[in-house]
Amino acid sequence: MALIKVKPTSAGRRAVVKVVTPGLHKGKPLAALLEPKKRGSGRNNNGHITVRHKGGGHKQHYRVVDFRRNKDGIPAKVERIEYDPNRSAHLALLCYADGERRYIIAPRGIAVGAQLVNGVEAPIKAGNCLPLRSIPVGSTVHCVEMMPGKGAQIARSAGTSVQLLAREGSYAQLRLRSGEIRKVHVDCRATLGECGNEEHSLRSIGKAGASRWRGIRPTVRGVVMNPVDHPHGGGEGRTAAGRHPVSPWGTPTKGYRTRSNKRTSNMIVRRRHAR
C-alpha cells in the first residue's frame, strides 16, 4: 500500500491524498454475490429525517459478505482482493474446495493464492476463523461475533482489531480499540489478524464534492439557522446559542447519555471512558 499526493492541477485536486493498493482487482465484482442497494437518504418510513447529512451519492451494489464463516473444515483459496464502496475495508473473494465462492473482509497481509480454513481445528494463522475458545490468549483478532452464530459485529472497519485478554468460564474478555473491555461468549467466532487497508485513515478526499459522491450532505451549524429550524438559531447578527449545546430536537449533545438498553451493561467490564 502506498500514499500518493496528487498534482495540484486545480483547487479541488490540491489536497487529495490517495491510498493505492497494488494487486487490487480491476474488473467487475462477482455478480452472484451482488444485491441491489436502496438509499434511504436518512429518512424513515414516514419520510421524516432521522439521520441528518445523508442523501444523494453514486449508485452502488451491495456485496454480500460472509460474516458468519460457518463453512468448517473446507479449505478455501483467495482468488482476488476487491474494492468495496460500502465499507472502508477491502474484500477477499474465497473459492472453497467444493466450488462455492464467498466474500470476506480482507485481513491485513493477505495475498492472492493464500489458503484459509474455518472451524475449531483451523491452524492459528491470519485470516482463519475460529471460536474464541480455540484462539490463544493475547492474540489479535477482528470480525468478532457478539452472539454465537449471529455473524461478526465487532472490528470490521479498515485497520481495526481486538485483543483477546482472558478466558473465564463461558466468556472471553476482549479489549476494543476504544479502550473498552467487554465479555463475549467463547463460542463466538473471530478471525485472526487485523482488518486490511490500514492506511485508509491517512487519505484525504480533497474537496466537498467527493463527500457528495459518497452520499454525505453538508453539516450546517445551528447558530446560523433561524429559530424555526434549530434551538440555537435566531438573534441579530452573530450570536451565541444562549444555552447548552443541543440537537435540532432539543437533546443535549455533549456528555449526555442516550443509551437505554441496560440489559447488556453486565457484559461491559471496563467502559471506554473509565480513567
Curated annotation (Swiss-Prot):
Entries under Gene3D superfamilies matching the protein: 2.30.30.30, Nucleic acid-binding proteins, Ribosomal protein L2, domain 3
Signal sequence, renumbered to the chain: none
GO cellular component: large ribosomal subunit
Annotated source species: Thiobacillus denitrificans (strain ATCC 25259 / T1)
Gene name of this polypeptide: rplB
Annotated family: Belongs to the universal ribosomal protein uL2 family.
Keywords: Ribonucleoprotein, Ribosomal protein, RNA-binding, rRNA-binding
Gene Ontology BP annotations: cytoplasmic translation
Quaternary organization: Part of the 50S ribosomal subunit. Forms a bridge to the 30S subunit in the 70S ribosome.
InterPro entries xref list: NA-bd_OB-fold, Rib_uL2_dom2, Ribosomal_uL2, Ribosomal_uL2_bac/org-type, Ribosomal_uL2_C, Ribosomal_uL2_CS, Ribosomal_uL2_dom3, Ribosomal_uL2_RNA-bd_dom
GO MF, one annotated term: transferase activity
Protein name: Large ribosomal subunit protein uL2
Region annotation (Disordered) ranges: 36-55, 223-275
Task of the protein: One of the primary rRNA binding proteins. Required for association of the 30S and 50S subunits to form the 70S ribosome, for tRNA binding and peptide bond formation. It has been suggested to have peptidyltransferase activity; this is somewhat controversial. Makes several contacts with the 16S rRNA in the 70S ribosome.
